[in-house]
Amino acid sequence: MERTLRKKRNGRVVSDKMDKTVVVAVETKVRHPLYGKTINKTTKFKVHDEKNEAKINDRVLIMETRPLSKDKRWRLVEIVEKAK
């Protein structure tokens, strides 16, 4: 699979307690089909972090990859912004 065709998401690290894995929350805006109100929908992804460099509240860019474990299908590309 071509790397350019893989999905990319921006999100925030909500957990870094696992070894080589972080949990990233990705927020998307969705319009309600009937009422038209914009709703923030949050999805959590388990992301492979080989060097254990991402910490809680970091903004990160993640990319789709082959299945690495039961739940991990995403990997860390870069840390966009470090937490303060």
Curated annotation (Swiss-Prot):
The keyword RNA-binding applies. Part of the 30S ribosomal subunit. Belongs to the universal ribosomal protein uS17 family. Gene3D superfamilies: Nucleic acid-binding proteins. GO terms for molecular function: rRNA binding; structural constituent of ribosome. One of its GO terms (cellular component) is cytosolic small ribosomal subunit. PANTHER family: 40S RIBOSOMAL PROTEIN S11 FAMILY MEMBER (PTHR10744), SMALL RIBOSOMAL SUBUNIT PROTEIN US17M (PTHR10744:SF1). It comes from the Bacteria. The keyword RNA-binding applies. InterPro entries: NA-bd_OB-fold, Ribosomal_uS17, Ribosomal_uS17_bact/chlr. This is Small ribosomal subunit protein uS17. It holds the Pfam family Ribosomal_S17. One of its GO terms (biological process) is translation. Keywords: Ribonucleoprotein, Ribosomal protein, RNA-binding, rRNA-binding. One of the primary rRNA binding proteins, it binds specifically to the 5'-end of 16S ribosomal RNA.
